[in-house]
Amino acid sequence: MDIIFCTPTYCKIMLMIIMLISLRTRCDTNNFLNCSVEKEEGEEEIISTNLKRINDDMNILGRILNDERNIKITDIVEMLQNEYDDKKKKKKKKKYIYRKKKSNNKINEINSVQHFNVKENILNEKKKNPLNDNFKNPKLRKHSPNNKKNKNKIGQIKFHIVGYDKKKITKYLTPSMISSIQKRLMNKNKKTNVNVNMSNGRVLPFFPKEYFLHSSTHEKKDKMATKKNNKEESIINERLLENLENISLSRTIKDIRGEEGNERKVKEEDNNIKEEGNSFKKYFKGVVKLYVDITEPNLEMIWQNYPPKSITGSGFIIEGHLIITNAHNISYSTRILIRKHGNSGKYEAKILYVAHDVDIAILTTDDKTFFDDVYALHFGALPSLKDEIITIGYPAGGDKLSVTEGIVSRIDVQYYKHSNYKFLLTQIDAPLNPGNSGGPALVRGKVVGICFQSYKVSNNISYIIPSTIISHFLLDIHKNKDYTGYAFLGVKYEPLENPSLREALGLEEMERKKIIKKNVGILITEVFEGHMSKQDDKYHDMDNKHHNVGDTHHNVGDTHHNVGDDHTDNLQGDTDYCTYILNSNIITSDKKNIYSDKKKKKIYSDNNNNNNNFNYYYNMHGEDEQSCYGLKKNDIILRVDGKDINNDGSVILRDNETVGFQHLFNEKFINDLCIIKIVRNKKIKSVMVKLYKVKYLLNQHNWDKRNKYFIYGGIVFSILTRSLYVYTQNPEINKLMLYNNFKKKSKDEIVVLKNILPTKITTGYYYTDSIVLRVNNIKVKNLKHLIELIEMTKYTNRLMYLKNNKHTLQSYINYYNTKITSLNINTIIHILILTTSGQKVPIVLNKRDVEKYNEEIKKIYSITRDRYVY
């Protein structure tokens, strides 16, 4: 048998070579553990992490190399085992049995060389191999010296290492120790999978946890890496993905029902579907009932919750063991149970993803027997007007399944009640009642929407979330391994229907000269600066990712010119968008092509005898990069990705159907690009815009999030959210919401005085729903800032005043302030508020009184914690 050992000097040289190869280090020849790393750009963090892990192993080997005698592998293993046993006794961990190696006297007599073939008379000794007793795996036992059939295969000793993360790693300690240890060090961040059949007996780790490759100090990082790898697995399987890719927003009636000129086949298919739809048994198997327990926050006593209550809803099953329902069904949920049709058993469900903006949620259950004998529903295209539609669900008035029938009456962009965002929706005349929410709406056996809201004022007006919105939600999860949300343009606009207004802006003259089409264009009145600013470097590629103009093929005009993959693959770093726009042949209409001339730096049009053609060109000489992307106030939007914007803010959806132009951006994903044709200073040009989430001063929804609050001396402070805004009667807040939608800074919040609790120190204060302007003469930025101002000392107050005095709510609220100079902030808290009547009123509290009665106030009003800030 070959025995592997080395002298301390040889091991030092060997390890130095390994570290030089693996990490490009410079090491001191006298102390190989102290190395200076040659860091390249972007590798500081990676190298420092790897070096730390290697140093852990070096410390172990360093202790071994301090021994002056010849070291054998069996001695190394025994030494590691003894150290682990000592630690195990101290920490009183669960006892494990590890392989222990016995020394061989005859082997100890061998001189120190790199390789040595032991004579056969030594192998024939009747001594057991110290590794043989502990090898439970038959594949490993074949290397035992007692196995006569394998005498010619005893050139290696295989050590089987099993990590605590259940991953098996097999290493060979061969005579070539350099390559062996080098392989180990170079593959620290890689998982090695070895197909080794485990026997019924448990194979214990060869090295204890402290000596394993990913152990102790790196345990948290390894867990995070495992979690990240699990997150990268998409929940959208191939069947569902194929179904989603076939859904189109602009499919015509001919595309849905069949090819042109094949009417007979279409009629036969429709008849078959109707005959099959008379029973609908298989579709019933795909619809489930939800039993949800919820606990909503109390908006009056903001530190408490309302008592728990139970609601019911509907959902339906799709491919991949997924269940689709409405987000408002499971908001603030503490437990969700689901029940199949025709089955009395209830299964506990869990939430995978929630999109509150479009009111969709994905559920599943860990009990996979639930999906036995169910039918996964498939999605269909956007329905056409007058299509017969069937809704299935569990509405109020009974416990069993209910089916209603109606027709598609309208497709438009309207507000979603749950989020207060505008998205595409489908109006139907089938009645929907509480409990129908989350159920499927079917056309020809395909899901074309999710039932979610109705119009109470009129009869038989209900709405469903169209399949195109559902498809975007699922594809976003598949693409980004998480739900990132919808992109918005981030502007306010005014329709340009008035002829006098169009004349003043120069549009009438452009129409007469046939430079632009008639009745197109909207005026931008306000722009979210954080969305359009180049200074924020938002138009540059982040993390070296490629950002395409949408994920699908968006045609600029009616020809097949792709603005997506052909050009935007090179959009990295500092991109010259003027050059990009010039390089793309911008198509302006189906009858007129506008081309770009790179040499002359002009965008011009061909002229022929057709009266609908446009005669103009735009000279791009002297254009800087700043002017080629982003929108500005007073710009007039004419086209978005080749689609004309009408003067009322609508755009053609398909055929002669029109919807709000916001839907063009709802088709795209976060960080997608679009080309927008505008009129700026009475000149026509094209600019690039990258789409982001818009940061609103008042969140449009705050579901599943508890309101922030801070209670001081019986005064309850909070931030203005939509849930609070609905219940406030302050006209100043109404003005604030009407005229100020976008945040000026990312951390801006409107801090409000929600109410004042009756206490001994709040006598005479009866204000509610008031805006907090200042604390101790310093303007309040957000709730966290307010807490800092109240709890600060005199010295920190001066520093805070100098640091934060420039920031002011006057950008949102205009008021005149009179400074109070005689304030002793060590004992007095002075709060300036704007009341519901528009008055600026001071509230003064004594810090000593607050400290004295603080515990009493908490006890009276059952306040367990005086603040909730995140």
UniProtKB/Swiss-Prot annotation:
Enzyme class: hydrolase
Induction details: By heat and oxidative stresses in trophozoites and schizonts (at protein level).
Membrane topology category: Peripheral membrane protein
InterPro entries found in the cross-reference section: DEGP_PDZ (IPR041517), DEGP_PDZ_sf (IPR046449), Peptidase_S1_PA (IPR009003), Peptidase_S1_PA_chymotrypsin (IPR043504), Peptidase_S1C (IPR001940)
Main location per the UniProt record: cytoplasm
Active site: H328, D359, S437
Protein localization: Cytoplasm; Parasitophorous vacuole; Host cell membrane; Host cytoplasm
Region (Disordered): 128-151
GO terms classed as biological process: proteolysis; response to oxidative stress; response to temperature stimulus
Entries under Pfam families matching the protein: PDZ_3, Trypsin_2
Gene Ontology molecular function, alphabetical: serine-type endopeptidase activity
Comp. bias intervals (Basic residues): 138-151
Enzyme Commission designation: 3.4.21.-
Note on domains (UniProt): The PDZ domain is dispensable for protease and chaperone activities.
Job description of the protein: Serine protease which also acts as a protein chaperone. Plays a role in the parasite development in host erythrocytes possibly by protecting it against thermal and oxidative stresses.
Family designation: Belongs to the peptidase S1C family.
Name assigned to this protein: Serine protease DegP homolog
Organism expressing this protein natively: Plasmodium falciparum (isolate 3D7)
Originating gene: DegP
